[in-house]
């Protein structure tokens, strides 16, 4: 039997083995890829996609990595199968035009049988059915008998990057858990017997747009060995979750829930596994700069967190528990991924905040479920059930359980249909790493950007687009997109909007309003003011210099702002987005709470101090490794090549940046923060102005304050006191109004006491209180019940708006003991008015949308009370 190894040892032995084969070890890339076509790093090869495409220089001829990955296309299988995960580590060895099939097969076999000591008789191999070379090599190099090398079709053993581009056959190594079953009638897809542990992709072909294959001039190797799967094999456990990579997290969930994983039923075990898996995913996502949100990768993180909370509740874990789970995961993986330790506080804060908000959302979901139950006559629709699950985290089982209590059923078939549609969307989104997307302008030569040194230049028109289609020429009045051979116009990027300006020629004037970059081509969008423009024309390109100066002042000010935030708040501040415009700047950053006025003042003062110190900026192009070694900040989501531009404000800030900047900070003049707000959980936004825009802002503010002073008939400096006085008066008036409404409701209630009827020894009162607001209606019901005593039963209704009904049921102890439940009672009555609701057995509220049916609802309430209490 092979030596038992822990997960860290497996990872290290793999990397050391390939280092001994002259591979360069590289660290894991971020889960947030440079590739804008992919939300998350879903494969070990993804960071090398530009290398495989020939768009970036290879970091070395041979490379080995342990790459962290997150996939959610099979999220419903997580915890239910032995080996599905959202987070996993892919160990890989890569060759960029260096070695090929023979070496890849030989080293793979040496690794699994020599280093990891897997018995050869337990290993099977698959090859692509047309790859005779691989079939022979497995027998020659590894000594495998032909019976244990299986030919398989393109679905499983031919790798494609997309409809066109690099592709090739692949070969997989499988571990046999049950060799005693013999070698006849073998199905490598039988998960109960075989586990795929190592995949070798031989990237040797290129497919063109007509589907024709040709040999690649430089053949590549892309491999992947799943760390969790190898750990399962070497540690002799029945599934990936019980390896030392995941099980310590599950152990923490055992402690918090008071349950034993090994004594749990199947559903409880699934919940334990989901929590163990998702904890690993969420700590890495947060550490890599992902924030919970409603779009893209932010939604993926939010969904994982909500699943954790839901499965924690299913295990009986009360209250907040995510930070405790995350602490175990950070300690478990921090040795291999030090950024987890560095981001520990950020991770715990983010998860605690999101968990707290979701627990509140769950309460909202419960109220929504009450409304759905209230308007459903026989069954809850599948659409509603899926909405409860997808938006509020309600499992189908919980919805069905609550519905059954009300005598309803759930349309499970429609629910499953909605779920399958979501799964299909996820599968389509994550099916492959597409190496060909975004190549629509690839046939054009790159546009040379001259804008760092020039504000004007001559240029030749290479392409004219009208409504997205290429045309030969366009005339005055047309809105067009133009591609030039060279340009001084800065294209929108890195948060900075594109330059504006003009293209001119003999009897030609084109006003340029927007400039964008598409791959290596720069598109100038504008309107032809005069003349005609055609492909091949020579034009003079001139940017609006005043606009450029404003935008570069704002861009440099943005760098200073980030440096000031890090100095005042701490290095954990991370940029989450930015906008650099002619008239303002906007900077989004990670921070869990609003800045105090003192912190805002500190940040603003620091920026203005650095401006006044007149720092001369350094703008250099250098290799990215050199830039990072100098401490230059790089940002998630930005695409960087092997050569990068570095903006250095000496002693203040150093960042990778392709934008335009002032030469000296003194050119900015002045910086003023306009606002600081929250835009999402854990994300703050600062809006500010710099340079001439500060004067415009101050003029506008001065105009507004003078108008307010005139309106209030006070001096400008007295405005705050006047506003405070008016606010105090308004609050006092509102209190008086609320008090009068409550008094009116109480008076109405007192007047109704005489209408109370005696039924079976109980005092019953059902009444309409006109347009009384819900809170006042509730107070009136409680007041009446107190007057009627423990044998009282009160149902009140009102129509506070044209499309709104409010209902309250308040029952004394005697009525409750008789079997009445205020929550169920008022919910049933509210259905008549097109609504629903619920609450406690003794006090509950409900609402409706049809005031014209309030009378019928109250009549029904009276009848139901008579029937229940008079018996």
From Swiss-Prot:
It holds the Pfam family tRNA_SAD. Keywords: Aminoacyl-tRNA synthetase, ATP-binding, Cytoplasm, Ligase, Metal-binding, Nucleotide-binding, Protein biosynthesis, RNA-binding, tRNA-binding, Zinc. GO terms for biological process: alanyl-tRNA aminoacylation. It is found in: Cytoplasm. Its cofactor is Zn(2+). Binds 1 zinc ion per subunit. HAMAP family: Ala_tRNA_synth_B. Disulfide bonds: none annotated. Its EC number is 6.1.1.7. It comes from the Bacteria. This is Alanine--tRNA ligase. It catalyses: tRNA(Ala) + L-alanine + ATP = L-alanyl-tRNA(Ala) + AMP + diphosphate. Zn(2+) binds at residues 555, 559, 657, 661. One of its GO terms (molecular function) is ATP binding. GO terms for cellular component: cytosol. SUPFAM superfamilies: Class II aaRS and biotin synthetases (SSF55681), Putative anticodon-binding domain of alanyl-tRNA synthetase (AlaRS) (SSF101353), ThrRS/AlaRS common domain (SSF55186), Translation proteins (SSF50447). The keyword Ligase applies. Belongs to the class-II aminoacyl-tRNA synthetase family. Consists of three domains; the N-terminal catalytic domain, the editing domain and the C-terminal C-Ala domain. The editing domain removes incorrectly charged amino acids, while the C-Ala domain, along with tRNA(Ala), serves as a bridge to cooperatively bring together the editing and aminoacylation centers thus stimulating deacylation of misacylated tRNAs. Residues 834-871 are annotated as: Disordered. The gene is alaS. PROSITE patterns: AA_TRNA_LIGASE_II_ALA (PS50860).
């Amino acid at each position: 039997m092979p030596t038992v190894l822990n997960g860290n040892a497996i990872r290290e032995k793999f990397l050391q083995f390939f280092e001994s084969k002259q591979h360069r070890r590289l660290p894991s890339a971020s889960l947030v890829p440079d590739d804008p076509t992919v939300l998350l790093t879903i494969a070990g090869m993804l960071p090398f996609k530009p290398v495989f495409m020939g768009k970036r220089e290879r970091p070395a001829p041979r490379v080995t990595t342990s790459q962290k990955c997150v996939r959610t296309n099979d999220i419903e299988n997580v915890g239910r199968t032995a080996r599905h995960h959202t987070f996993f580590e892919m160990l890989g060895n890569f060759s960029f035009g260096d070695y090929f099939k023979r070496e890849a097969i030989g080293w793979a076999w040496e690794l699994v049988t020599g280093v990891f000591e897997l018995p050869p008789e337990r290993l099977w191999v698959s090859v692509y059915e047309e790859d005779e070379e691989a079939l022979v090599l497995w027998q020659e190099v590894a000594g495998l008998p032909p019976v244990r090398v299986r030919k398989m079709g393109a679905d499983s053993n031919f790798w494609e990057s997309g409809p066109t581009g690099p592709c090739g056959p692949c070969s997989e190594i499988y571990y046999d858990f049950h060799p005693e079953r013999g070698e006849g009638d073998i199905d490598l897809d039988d998960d109960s017997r075989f586990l795929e542990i190592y995949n070798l992709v031989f990237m040797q072909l290129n497919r063109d747009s007509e589907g024709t294959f040709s040999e690649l001039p430089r053949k590549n190797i892309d491999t992947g060995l799943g760390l969790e799967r190898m750990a399962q094999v070497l540690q002799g456990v029945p599934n990936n979750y019980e390896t030392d990579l995941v099980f310590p997290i599950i152990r923490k969930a055992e402690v918090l829930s008071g349950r034993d994983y090994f004594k749990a039923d199947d559903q409880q075990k699934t919940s334990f596994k989901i929590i163990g898996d998702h904890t690993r995913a969420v700590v890495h996502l947060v550490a890599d700069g992902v924030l919970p949100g409603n779009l893209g990768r932010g939604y993926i993180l939010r969904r994982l967190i909500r699943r954790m909370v839901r499965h924690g509740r299913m295990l009986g874990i009360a209250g907040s528990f995510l930070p405790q789970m995350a602490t175990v995961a950070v300690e478990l993986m921090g040795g291999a991924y030090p950024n987890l330790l560095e981001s520990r506080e950020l991770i715990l804060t983010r998860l605690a905040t999101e968990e707290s908000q979701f627990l509140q959302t769950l309460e909202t979901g419960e109220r929504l479920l009450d409304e759905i139950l209230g308007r459903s006559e026989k069954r809850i629709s599948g659409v509603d059930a899926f909405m409860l699950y997808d938006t509020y985290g309600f499992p189908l089982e919980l919805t069905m359980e609550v519905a059954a209590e009300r005598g309803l059923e759930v349309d499970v078939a429609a629910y499953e249909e909605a779920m399958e549609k979501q799964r299909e969307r996820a599968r389509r989104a994550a099916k492959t790493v597409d190496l060909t997307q975004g190549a629509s302008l690839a046939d054009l030569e790159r546009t040379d950007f001259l804008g760092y040194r020039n504000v004007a230049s001559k240029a030749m028109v290479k392409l004219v687009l009208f409504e997205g289609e290429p045309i030969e020429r366009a005339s005055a009045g047309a809105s067009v997109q133009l591609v030039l051979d060279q340009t001084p116009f800065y294209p929108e990027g890195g948060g900075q909007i594109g330059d504006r300006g003009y293209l001119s020629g003999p009897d030609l004037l084109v006003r340029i309003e927007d400039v964008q970059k598409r791959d290596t081509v720069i598109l100038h969008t504008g309107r032809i003011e005069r003349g005609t423009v055609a492909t091949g024309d020579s034009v003079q390109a001139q940017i609006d210099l005043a606009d450029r100066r404003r935008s570069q002042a704002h861009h440099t000010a943005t760098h200073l702002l980030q440096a000031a935030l890090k100095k005042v708040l701490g290095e954990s501040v991370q940029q989450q987005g930015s906008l650099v415009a002619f008239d303002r700047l906007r900077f989004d950053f990670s921070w869990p709470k609003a800045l105090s006025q003192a912190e805002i003042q500190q940040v603003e003062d620091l920026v203005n101090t650095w401006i006044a110190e007149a720092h001369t900026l350094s703008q250099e192009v250098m290799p990215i490794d050199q830039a990072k070694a100098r401490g230059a900040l790089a940002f998630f989501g930005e695409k960087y090549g092997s050569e990068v531009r570095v903006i250095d404000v000496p002693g203040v800030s150093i960042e990778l940046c392709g934008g335009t900047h002032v030469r000296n900070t003194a050119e900015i003049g002045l910086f003023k923060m306009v606002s600081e707000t929250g835009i999402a959980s854990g994300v703050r936004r600062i809006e500010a102005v710099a340079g001439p825009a500060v004067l415009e802002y101050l003029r506008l503010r001065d105009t507004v304050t003078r108008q307010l002073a005139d309106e209030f008939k006070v001096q400008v400096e007295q405005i705050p006191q006047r506003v405070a006085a008016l606010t105090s008066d308004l609050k006092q008036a509102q209190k008086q109004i609320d008090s009068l409404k409550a008094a009116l409701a109480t008076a109405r209630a007192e007047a109704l006491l005489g209408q109370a009827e005696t039924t079976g020894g109980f005092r019953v009162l059902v009444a309409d209180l006109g347009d009384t607001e819900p809170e006042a209606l509730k107070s009136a019901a409680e007041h009446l019940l107190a007057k009627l005593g423990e044998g009282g039963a009160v149902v009140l209704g009102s129509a506070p708006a044209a499309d709104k009904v409010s209902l309250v049921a308040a029952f004394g102890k005697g009525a409750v003991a008789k079997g009445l439940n205020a929550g169920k009672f008022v919910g049933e009555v509210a259905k008549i008015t097109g609504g629903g609701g619920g609450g406690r057995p003794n006090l509950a509220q409900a609402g409706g949308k049809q005031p014209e049916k309030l009378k019928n609802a109250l009549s029904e309430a009276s009848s139901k009370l008579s029937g229940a209490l008079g018996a």
